[in-house]
């Protein structure tokens, strides 16, 4: 009986590993957009933090360079937060019901 339980646990662990890999692959394809300056600067990135595009409204190009740099940084940070929230939501569905310690995130 113990051998059967161990085999079942190993099968569950393998299925979980496969599901995590699939979720990670899906996250690499999901794109989120961060914005700043009421949408004047936008950063499009995947949930794996690969930046795909930065869009800057032409009206900002004649403005202060420091302000533009701040807006780009703010849009990037907004995109990172959105990617993290999307990743957490996606992975949370996989780990629902698992006895993980508080604050522990998957993948490790």
Swiss-Prot record:
Coiled coil: none annotated. Pfam families: YbaB_DNA_bd. GO terms for cellular component: bacterial nucleoid; cytosol. It is found in: Cytoplasm, Nucleoid. The keyword DNA-binding applies. Residues 99-108 have a biased composition (Pro residues). Residues 86-108 are annotated as: Disordered. InterPro entries: YbaB-like_sf, YbaB/EbfC. Transmembrane segments: none annotated. GO terms for molecular function: DNA binding. Keywords: Cytoplasm, DNA-binding. The keyword Membrane does not apply. Binds to DNA and alters its conformation. May be involved in regulation of gene expression, nucleoid organization and DNA protection. Belongs to the YbaB/EbfC family. Homodimer. PANTHER family: NUCLEOID-ASSOCIATED PROTEIN YBAB. This is Nucleoid-associated protein Mpe_A2533. It comes from Methylibium petroleiphilum (strain ATCC BAA-1232 / LMG 22953 / PM1).
